[in-house]
Amino acid sequence: MPCPRLLAALFCSSGLFAASGDFCDSSLCLHGGTCLLNEDRTPPFYCLCPEGFTGLLCNETEHGPCFPNPCHNDAECQVTDDSHRGDVFIQYICKCPLGYVGIHCETTCTSPLGMQTGAIADSQISASSMHLGFMGLQRWAPELARLHQTGIVNAWTSGNYDKNPWIQVNLMRKMWVTGVVTQGASRAGSAEYLKTFKVAYSTDGRQFQFIQVAGRSGDKIFIGNVNNSGLKINLFDTPLETQYVRLVPIICHRGCTLRFELLGCELNGCTEPLGLKDNTIPNKQITASSYYKTWGLSAFSWFPYYARLDNQGKFNAWTAQTNSASEWLQIDLGSQKRVTGIITQGARDFGHIQYVAAYRVAYGDDGVTWTEYKDPGASESKIFPGNMDNNSHKKNIFETPFQARFVRIQPVAWHNRITLRVELLGC
């Protein structure tokens, strides 16, 4: 077959293709491009180029807002117009994979938000109804709907005559919510659980909208559990920026009985534990104004470095020597970090419940000069609400995060003795 004229003729004369005229025999396409025949046209072939390359032979680097891909974690970069985005990153958006958020999908966002640990308080959980069992003495109340809750009455169950049941959580501020983990329970010896459910959300607690099916109209129906004890994880196609999350049972096995956890992260995306619980921060970097010895015995000391969230053992927290507002616990982060929040926890001393009920936070870079945290526009340092028992987590997020190496916690109110286990959040 004679060579086509012009460009194809150049390839002919250069001997880059077989005598039979099959232009794809010589693998003309560069950078892993795929050669496809384009018979009866000029040129008689074309190259299907991999991402990032263009040109007749995939010999040119593709340019544009998505090349190279600015998105992280294998997110898809989508070219758009300036009117689609209101921020400085014009011409593209990043479509995040499940469990990631951020302008560039840079933040992993699947942390438990506090149902299981108690960081979400009982008062933040409400429902359309609840079941009253055993002559009204058993309250299957919404505040029991915590993942892995134990006991004879250990979950939320809707009322017998509730035709449109729901349970909701008020997160107290806008957060990213990326998924939910559900679990059933056993009631009167029988397994009960949600087989399917919907998820609604709201920013004001009054007007709710349901998560929709991706790419189609209609409310999304999530698949729930198949027994009373197993866990079912559902991640949302699109993260929710919301304050209220409502689970609406659709099909229930025997009764609408639920334990659950919400997954997500703070909007600022900088809420990773800074190293107290996992011992990344060494003992020598955790100090205090004093520490208590039960019965005055050194063997029964409540050292500062015991003040790690969820620490276990007979002596598993820091306790101050005196109940005085002059006492403090100090953490040296080792280098300057962005600190966005704190989680506190109390402990027991031979059966006596002890915790810090309120405290201030101070910070600095040299361990000598301190700045007490204040809310924006406030003239007085902020007093943070602390714990109400010895074991639950209490999370406080700083409205204005700060940069610091040293963080000091200053108790101002306590129950029995000043006792703390703690984790700092940030990045």
UniProtKB/Swiss-Prot annotation:
GO cellular component: acrosomal membrane; extracellular region
Name of one Pfam family that matches: EGF
Residues that carry a glycan: 27, 34, 59, 227
Sorted UniProt keywords: Angiogenesis, Cell adhesion, Cytoplasmic vesicle, Disulfide bond, EGF-like domain, Fertilization, Glycoprotein, Membrane, Repeat, Secreted, Signal
Disulfide bond as UniProt keyword: yes
Family annotation (SMART domains): EGF, FA58C
UniProt key word Ribosomal protein: no
Biological function: Contributes to phagocytic removal of apoptotic cells in many tissues. Plays an important role in the maintenance of intestinal epithelial homeostasis and the promotion of mucosal healing. Promotes VEGF-dependent neovascularization. Specific ligand for the alpha-v/beta-3 and alpha-v/beta-5 receptors. Also binds to phosphatidylserine-enriched cell surfaces in a receptor-independent manner. Zona pellucida-binding protein which may play a role in gamete interaction.
Gene3D superfamilies with a match to the protein in the record: Galactose-binding domain-like, Laminin
Signal peptide interval: 1-18
BP GO annotations: angiogenesis; cell adhesion; single fertilization
Major localization listed first in the record, in broad terms: membrane
PTM per Swiss-Prot/TrEMBL: The two O-linked glycans consist of Gal, GlcNAc and Fuc, with probably Fuc as reducing terminal sugar.
Annotated disulfide bonds: 24-35, 29-47, 49-58, 66-77, 71-94, 96-105, 109-265, 252-256, 270-427
Ranges of residues in domain F5/8 type C: 109-265, 270-427
Coiled-coil annotated spans: none
Stretches assigned to the EGF-like domain: 20-59, 62-106
Subcellular location per the Swiss-Prot or TrEMBL entry: Membrane; Secreted; Cytoplasmic vesicle, Secretory vesicle, Acrosome membrane
Top-level division of the source organism's lineage: Eukaryota
Domain notes: The F5/8 type C 2 domain mediates high-affinity binding to phosphatidylserine-containing membranes.
Entry comment describing in which tissues the protein is expressed: Milk and spermatozoan. Also present in epididymis, kidney, heart, lymphatic gland and spleen but not esophagus, small intestine, muscle and liver.
Membrane topology: Peripheral membrane protein
Protein name in UniProt: Lactadherin
Cell attachment site, short sequence motif: residues: 85-87
PROSITE patterns, sorted: EGF_1 (PS00022), EGF_2 (PS01186), EGF_3 (PS50026), FA58C_1 (PS01285), FA58C_2 (PS01286), FA58C_3 (PS50022)
